[in-house]
């Protein structure tokens, strides 16, 4: 039995088929302007179809034949005409108002709607001369789209003017906000897909308007592309009442201007008037703030464009709805090469744009089409902000050596590892007051980076309460960006970096997983950029992971997850770096190196609590430069073959490995132990797999070819096996790490549960060395008793034994 659908009482208010509706009234365009704007849009739509369908006859100079059709039809029509419509009107605004503007396309698979205008404005051909403004160039342009050896269906790094791919939905507003920071003359037009608006990251990022200072920052103009449908379903925002949608957007702090309809001429007039009003609102807010010197939060404008999905496609194909329905999403006319009726339909559709009026005899867009685009670097495809390396200035970095701590002897004093880093970052911010920002999800103070507030407060432009004076550290000109959304912060940082600036993000280790997929997308972006000669170098994304697993004993199981490193290792070796500095001075050395680097994602793992300190500054620099090495002071094998290699990576695993080494040397003075600490995790991979990898000769020299290696690791143990599985001595490598054995513990109990503690490691060594396997039975028994005693003490007192918590290296 067919389901009966009650027709919505809001249908007449929401349908795009009927008279055009707009919040802003007026007809700013004369008839000639309407004609030219519409011609440019027609050309964009023709190009979008050509990209999806054609491998021959690009200008339909002859009847369309099956051999002109691509063998495999890929791409997405649905949002392309709507994106091209927006781009066309932004071009007009740039020319009229002399705007510095870049464009971001949030809707999924919208590249045809962006690539078309890029081609017409000439920016595409300037970067890719084989796609010039000729019939042959146009054919090359069509063929490459969604084609092996060509380009994808998103605004990939190969797309001029793009810093937002849109492959994974949800980040367009946060990227736009980051781009606008410290760019007072820039307007970032960010088209939000109405399907994209259902994602968690996008839903949260409507709040970016609380992070833009109208004095020093540029503006973001959100444009909600309300075309009504996702792949196979209606979108939520398109199916709530007009009042509810307007109230929602007003509640987020915007002034929403609606443009709704499908009839081209009246929609052009409405969109032109609305874009003009939006620019006026932006300039008025900025002018007032800059004249008064008082930064208040404006009610920024945004545009809601309600128009048909797949606009200008046939309303129906084979008796089924297409334009204005989800069937327009991908390839509306299928099986074209084999179905003569479909071929005829496609040809009629393409000819409806009248390509003979849009391109001259040589295949070049006619002059009036080209004149609709801005000139030079005002073209959004060539705006330098969208290739941020053109604008990047080197950071002024103070000498990190001046922020270290004195370490007279290894393993004797404690210090909070991240606190001196905060002092270092404070002075980085002082020296770079216009191109460096610090990001954190309400955790910078918790992560002991709060020294930065002496140089720059936390940005805050919402309401203030009297109690904020008591340590709130809030200011409308702050440069520390805090919001409890890792997604939004990561997006802001990416947008900031890709437009030529520098930044640093810290977050809790367990919850960095929130941005796993964002990390993936940025790594992919950088990897492709490294292959494009025209893409300029950008600053690396520096990510400090702290509040780490081994000091989350008090917060419990949910806060214990070091698995982000596994995610990082999956990505291309040309962009990923992982560092696990064990103490203050090594952390400072690593941070300095990362801040100076380009085109990488640097992941630094360092806990914030008090930890033993092992290296003076000179030793730390030498050790970090090598990436790993033997700690002579903890080893006793000099000039001899070791009986065992004790290796470690991470602050707590290093402490426990040292304590185990001390226990073993006390019990078995003749035992030759080589102690190796690893800072640069990718040193473990062969040099053929990662540029930082050790040669096999160097690896074998350090880790031996046949001796047991006990490796105490910060993360999940199998990651070390993944990295080192090709090594000669891998069969003798025994890795200890986090194994999901956690709860509310003391630090040592958590270590015992996961067998990274000193006693478990010492027992492991005894079991691996035949010469002491039997004679060591008494020592093993004592170590097990000590484990039991430590547990009992923790259960009774809630803390570790003083001799454990206060352990020092006995050297």
From Swiss-Prot:
InterPro entries: Phosphoketolase, THDP-binding, Transketo_C/PFOR_II, Xul5P/Fru6P_PKetolase, Xul5P/Fru6P_PKetolase_C, Xul5P/Fru6P_PKetolase_CS, Xul5P/Fru6P_PKetolase_N, Xul5P/Fru6P_PKetolase_ThDP_BS
Class of the enzyme per the UniProt entry, highest EC level: lyase
Gene3D superfamilies with a match to the protein in the record: 3.40.50.920, 3.40.50.970
GO molecular function, one term: aldehyde-lyase activity
Enzyme Commission code(s) on record: 4.1.2.-
Cofactor: thiamine diphosphate
SUPFAM superfamilies: Thiamin diphosphate-binding fold (THDP-binding) (SSF52518)
Keyword flag Lyase: yes
One Pfam family matching this protein: XFP
PROSITE patterns per record: PHOSPHOKETOLASE_1, PHOSPHOKETOLASE_2
Sorted UniProt keywords: Lyase, Thiamine pyrophosphate
One GO-annotated biological process of the protein: carbohydrate metabolic process
Family to which the UniProt record says this protein belongs: Belongs to the XFP family.
Protein name: Probable phosphoketolase
Originating species: Methylococcus capsulatus (strain ATCC 33009 / NCIMB 11132 / Bath)
